[in-house]
Amino acid sequence: MGCHMVAVLVLTTFVCFVIVDYFLQTRRPHALKVVAASAEPEEVSFPINIVSGFKLPAGLSYHSGHAWAAKESRNVVRIGLDDFAVRLLGKIDQLDLPARGRWLRQGEKGWTLARGGHRFEMLSPIEGEVVDVNPEVLKDPSVIHKDPYGTGWLVAVNSPAADSNLKNLLRGRLAQRWMEESVATLHTHVSPSTGVHLQDGGHAISDLLSILPEERWERVVRELFLA
């Protein structure tokens, strides 16, 4: 009889532990979901090539109007300015970015940048609906200059034809040759008599417009941005 009572007590204790553990487990999933939902997405970095003094990360796709595109998911593509555009414009005073819900067309006007009373249009590298706008660059355009391929991104677009759009852009060796041609074109606008060099210690200077007469700014930018 004594052994029987011990067995019953052991079984009862085990059942109690199971019941307590069950209730504890049913109260945990909400906390786990919050952690999962708030987790930052893993950043993907690419090797950065230096082409004629300008940064040109591998793994991105480039529009010949000097905007980059990076696919983030099946149809979502993030867009920004390349290093050439940023260094050409120098200090950006204002940005006019497309609002959420606006439909962009590949190769057509996407946004406008302003400097010193001059306004410069740029072309969208991707067609689709704007689903996100970077508030940081609207508050402080200098963010673009500090990190054009990272925190200085402009907008994200939901593009149903993302893959076919990206095939129209430049990558790899083609992108490098295009960058070299853009730099060569810029050289034609810089008078040798000024004694100014586009590069400073291997990298392009950070305010290329400043070495050009202001009355030529808009013509030079339109030619290079294809706008």
Each language-model region and where it sits:
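Contiguous, well-folded functional domains in the mature portion of proteins
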Residues: 2-227
